[in-house]
Amino acid sequence: MLKEYLGISLFLAAGLIIPFLAFAVSRLLQTRKNSLVKGEPYECGMETIGDTWIQFKSNYFLYALVFVAFDVETVFLYPWAVKFQQLGTFAIVEMFIFITILVVGFWYAWKEGALEWK
């Protein structure tokens, strides 16, 4: 029974160990010399005038979030479209329900004004 889970266990272990190992190696190899120049903001080689920090509009984040949500739709639609002829009626109904949920989500985002630039 344990042999069945060996492959997924190895992938899980590798997925956890490799990022931590990469961060550890990066931390060990980094340079640690701090100076005043490194702390200054760089803007075309000129000294900045005024406040360099501006408030970031949340509209960009909202557009990105909506884009990712509907981009995932294409990831699921592509394999279904490739095997469309071999799939039965159940798969067609299932995809219809999936697309309906996404259309309702798109309609809700539109209704709430998430797609309007303010």
From Swiss-Prot:
It is a multi-pass membrane protein. Keywords: Cell membrane, Membrane, NAD, Quinone, Translocase, Transmembrane, Transmembrane helix, Transport. One of its GO terms (cellular component) is NADH dehydrogenase complex. The chain crosses the membrane at residues 5-25, 61-81, 90-110. Its EC number is 7.1.1.-. NDH-1 shuttles electrons from NADH, via FMN and iron-sulfur (Fe-S) centers, to quinones in the respiratory chain. The immediate electron acceptor for the enzyme in this species is believed to be a menaquinone. Couples the redox reaction to proton translocation (for every two electrons transferred, four hydrogen ions are translocated across the cytoplasmic membrane), and thus conserves the redox energy in a proton gradient. This is NADH-quinone oxidoreductase subunit A.
